[in-house]
Amino acid sequence: MDRQPERENDELPSPAIISDRVLVNGVVTPLTLTAEGELRSTESGRRKSTLAKEILSFVVEGNKVRVKTLVEKGGGICCRGSAGDYARNDFVFEPLSDESRKLWSDKFHQHLVSLGRPKKLLVFVNPFGGKKTARKIFQEEVKPLFEDANIQLEIQETKYQLHAKEIVRSMDVSKYDGIVCVSGDGILVEVVNGLLEREDWKTAIKLPIGMVPAGSGNGMIKSLLEPVGLPCSATSATISIIRGRTRSLDVATISQGTTKFFSVLMLAWGLVADIDIESEKFRWMGSARFDIYGLQRIICLRQYHGRILFVPAPGFESYGQRASCSIDKEPSGSDKTLVYQGPDSKLENLDWREMKGPFVSVWLHNVPWGAENTLAAPDAKFSDGFLDLIVMKDCPKLALLSLMTKLSDGTHVQSPYASYLKVKAFVLEPGARIDEPDKEGIIDSDGEVLARGRKSYKCDQKALMSYDKLQISVDQGLATLFSPE
């Protein structure tokens, strides 16, 4: 005789959606799905559970129900992985009646739908970034998880620089629940700029963007995963996307006349920019190129003339000297389109302060991590409406060398030779080198050259902006990211 589903509410942390006795490995076992999404069973007198975040999907196979899960560190209802590892496992049970099986299927489906997980994603894979392993990472680690979670994928390999930006500018955003970048940070930057160059940018920029580390930088995904104790891995990143949770992200608009660039990571001028860009000549060294060329740049230290102006966040008004700031405005006859023009703020009416050179380094950050091993701005927040500014002026070479070795844990900002503050708006007026006045520097934003000064590295190559005054303003929470919490 078929057994009807019944509720068993003893010691449950939340009400049961469904509770019944089922067969697990041939043994009749109580099984409960709670309103919090916890799947609980008892085998051999020992209670086990799988949290909702571990369940990828389910499938009915004849008389049985297969629950596909991803668990970590030995937890979960069926995990046999070692500590610190993720393990993909199937938990299989057999309801004792057709009615019970249908009810389990309906309740599982309703619960997964209620979580708001993505159903279809546009995935960019950059096969040229970093160690050129993005294609392999996607096929072996990322795609199988998305398939187990029943997420439809439209896959696009990028073929050249700005390819992703071109696609995003013209695609039908209503077809997707999000965009995924299997790459370093570069494709993310292209996607954000593409979304903001659309006439429907107000809707488009709210499309969640997910990152899977497969490049040389990976600062954004490191900033997302590190605070919750997750490793910066493709698996951790993918499961965060599958769960569908999101968070807002500030976007900085860098302007020079009518030219604009939308930044989500950082801007650098001076030492950090020189190391980042000029070390490309040693790319064959891998990540060691930054350390080796960084040492060379410290030994042969450059300082730059210039001036920076900024609007400090509350609590940072003591930095710099009070100053007036002339904000560049677009010519009245400029071609105004419906695309995003930057935050609507009256910058000239704000309380501006200034610092004058010489400068060793000027570094602005939107998120804590600049790369997987560089905690550039430990106090940076994703959507506080401010950029974190790190300024180094006069600094002995030995002290600078010590300071640079502390980038991995963020303690470099505690150095007496570093000023660390938060700003709402920023103006950079870059100048020439102190020791070689006929040479200028490089302005680097989000890993790409924004401007090349006179006689700088590869100065003959075209850049988006000129080596001159530029201004930056922040639009709080403009973009949206898939996030682990």
UniProtKB/Swiss-Prot annotation:
Binding residue positions for ATP: N126, P127, F128, T158, E190, G215, S216, G217, R283, R289, D446, G447, E448
Q: Which co-factor is required? A: Mg(2+)
Question: Which InterPro entries does the record match to this protein?
Answer: ATP-NAD_kinase_N (IPR017438), Diacylglycerol_kinase_cat_dom (IPR001206), Lipid_Phosphate_FormReg (IPR050187), NAD/diacylglycerol_kinase_sf (IPR016064), YegS/DAGK_C (IPR045540)
Q: Which PROSITE patterns match?
A: DAGK
List the record's Gene Ontology CC terms alphabetically: plant-type vacuole; plant-type vacuole membrane
Q: As annotated in Swiss-Prot or TrEMBL, what is the tissue specificity of this protein? A: Highly expressed in stems and flowers and at lower levels in roots, leaves and siliques.
Catalytic residues at D185 (proton donor/acceptor)
Per UniProt, activity regulation is: Activated by phosphatidic acid (PA). Binding with PA stimulates the activity by promoting the binding of substrate to the catalytic site.
The topology of this chain with respect to the membrane is: Peripheral membrane protein
Coiled-coil regions, chain positions: none
GO BP terms: cellular response to abscisic acid stimulus; response to abscisic acid; seed germination; sphingolipid metabolic process
Q: Which UniProt keywords apply?
A: ATP-binding, Kinase, Membrane, Nucleotide-binding, Stress response, Transferase, Vacuole
| UniProt-listed Enzyme Commission number(s) | 2.7.1.91
Protein role: Involved in the production of sphingolipid metabolites. Phosphorylates sphingosine and various sphingoid long-chain base (LCB) products, such as phytosphingosine (PHS, 4-hydroxysphinganine), 4-hydroxy-8-sphingenine, 4,8-sphingadienine, D-erythro-dihydrosphingosine and D,L-threo-dihydrosphingosine. Is required for abscisic acid (ABA) signaling that mediates stomatal closure, inhibition of seed germination and root elongation. May function upstream of PLDALPHA1 and phosphatidic acid (PA) in an amplification response to ABA that mediates stomatal closure.
What is this protein called in UniProt?
Answer: Sphingosine kinase 1
UniProt source species? Arabidopsis thaliana
What taxonomic lineage is listed for the species of origin?
Eukaryota, Viridiplantae, Streptophyta, Embryophyta, Tracheophyta
